[in-house]
Amino acid sequence: MSTIKVNNADIYYEDSEPNDSQKSVIVFAHGLLWSSRMYDKQVEHFKKDYRCVAFDFRGQGQSQTTKDGYDMDSLTQDTIALLDALGIDKCHFVGLSMGGFVAQRIAIRHPERLLSLSLLETSADPEDPKNIPEYRKLLKAIRWLGMKRVSQKVMPIMFGSTFLAAKERKADRKEWLSVLQSNRKGGTIKATTGVIDREGIYEQLGDIQTPTLIIVGDEDAATPYTKSERIHFAIDGSKLAIIKGAGHTSTVEEPEQVNRVLGEFLDNIEGWY
């Protein structure tokens, strides 16, 4: 558990094997309003065989909130700078939602840094215009009321109906609601604005030659199956997997399914090297 100065921000990261140069590296990039914690179950599962690095984007989790630098291009530059600072030449890159926006840009602009690309609950398109007014209202509510007051409204965006209804997941729901409520107002507003205002990169996906896995929850309302299918059709040779009973946060909702699908994909990639 450390922080490192990346561009003009102190970036928080966790590194399971900071001194191990023998293992292949998996880098995990989280979604909007979350942090590296959303990959706890993946890091625990994969750290025996891989060096696992999970980090918090600026303004989120335990990373510093800065005045600017929240557009997807800047976050991509931050991520490459983090890899450089940690001495990571190549890695398996896993990005969920906003982390997937960044992951796709890395694959397009810095393909030499990737062993593989895994995209979870994400999109290559700009924000759907019909969603923008609702997100603007959400930002206004956060600005005036704070994250704690609006977090209950965010839960159905982040999680599917299976997770939200399961009695045995009550403690999990309470834990992740608390994580949402802990978001800092300033960082949340800046990061959300960066997501809303992002440019689409769909037309560039054909340039991606990196082995790619696309994962989507069958209950994902924020970036539904059709978004993942579009990416799948655009990236030659990519694989598409559906996680049953998961919404927009499959790493938390159905970690065993995600770990199995991701593990099988990584095993195949590792066999090529």
Predicted regions and their residues:
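Conserved HGGG/HGGXW glycine-rich cap/lid loop of the alpha/beta-hydrolase fold
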Residues: 9-68
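Conserved acidic catalytic loop of the alpha/beta-hydrolase fold
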Residues: 74-91
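Gly/Ala-rich beta-loop-alpha elbow adjacent to hydrolase catalytic centers
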Residues: 95, 99, 103
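Flexible "cap/lid" loop of the alpha/beta hydrolase fold
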Residues: 104-109, 114-144
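Short beta-strand/loop motif that positions the catalytic acidic residue
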Residues: 208, 214-216
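Catalytic active-site module of serine/aspartate enzymes centered on a nucleophile-bearing elbow/loop
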Residues: 238-273
